[in-house]
């Protein structure tokens, strides 16, 4: 599937009634934006579908009718090992991650990126990791103050900037990059399961934006939540429930 990054960007803007993500199309994004977009079945929209609708689309317009599959299971990958992340890519395809981006750390043709340990933080940037190469030469990276990665190996990344380099918008990101998979730019995640959206399937939800903020329960061992829905529209069989938590070993 080739989902439209432009649609997610426009969807994740403040609506005319003031609701939604508090940002405009040129603002930075948030780590939870893509999670909300996918888990609320507002996306993704196939690029080919969006291309035919783009001229008439506004952030207030609902295009969820063009979403064919809805995410039903998403796994956080923070604190995962390199081998576990590789397995996630093998099992479920690309994963969402973020790193600290500055043009200073790119090589000359913008196909390789390495930010050494101890480097100052720059702007966070979200990417899709689609593969890896354990033998990708460390010599391909730009030496920062004479420093290269200690070892070969890099993740293959699909960026969202179009065909801006000789790899058609892909680039290699060193395994040893300082901020990739760090707590600075969490969360990283993979979509582990989806369901086909048909006329017989409906997602009942109180809002469509996902987790627009987070909070902790420090002293409680259990938490109870209540959502109230109206099932009078003919959708009267509840076969699953989704909720979000960052607790380890949760399913």
List each model region and its residues.
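Predominantly the structural core of cysteine protease catalytic domains
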Residues: 7-154, 158, 162-238, 242-249
């Amino acid at each position: 599937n080739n989902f439209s990054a432009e649609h997610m960007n426009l969807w994740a803007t403040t609506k005319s009634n003031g609701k939604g993500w508090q940002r405009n199309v040129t603002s930075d994004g948030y780590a939870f934006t893509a999670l909300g977009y996918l888990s609320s079945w507002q996306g993704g929209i196939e690029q080919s579908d969006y291309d035919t609708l783009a001229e008439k689309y506004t952030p207030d317009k609902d295009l969820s009718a063009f979403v064919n599959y809805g995410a039903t299971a998403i796994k956080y990958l923070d604190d995962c090992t390199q081998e576990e992340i590789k397995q996630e890519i093998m099992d479920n395809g690309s994963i969402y991650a973020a790193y600290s981006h500055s043009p200073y750390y790119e090589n000359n043709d913008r196909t390789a990126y390495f930010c050494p340990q101890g480097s100052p933080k720059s702007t966070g940037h979200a990417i899709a990791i689609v593969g890896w190469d354990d033998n990708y030469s460390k010599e391909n990276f730009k030496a920062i103050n004479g420093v290269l990665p200690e070892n070969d190996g890099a993740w293959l990344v699909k960026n969202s900037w179009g065909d801006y380099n000789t790899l058609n918008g892909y680039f290699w990101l060193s395994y040893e990059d300082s901020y990739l998979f760090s707590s600075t730019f969490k969360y990283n995640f993979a979509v582990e399961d989806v369901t086909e959206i048909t006329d017989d399937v409906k997602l009942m939800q109180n809002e469509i934006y996902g987790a627009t903020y987070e909070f902790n329960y420090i002293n409680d061992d259990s938490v109870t939540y209540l959502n109230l829905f109206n099932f009078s529209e003919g959708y009267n069989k509840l076969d699953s429930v989704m909720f979000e938590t960052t607790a380890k070993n949760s399913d």
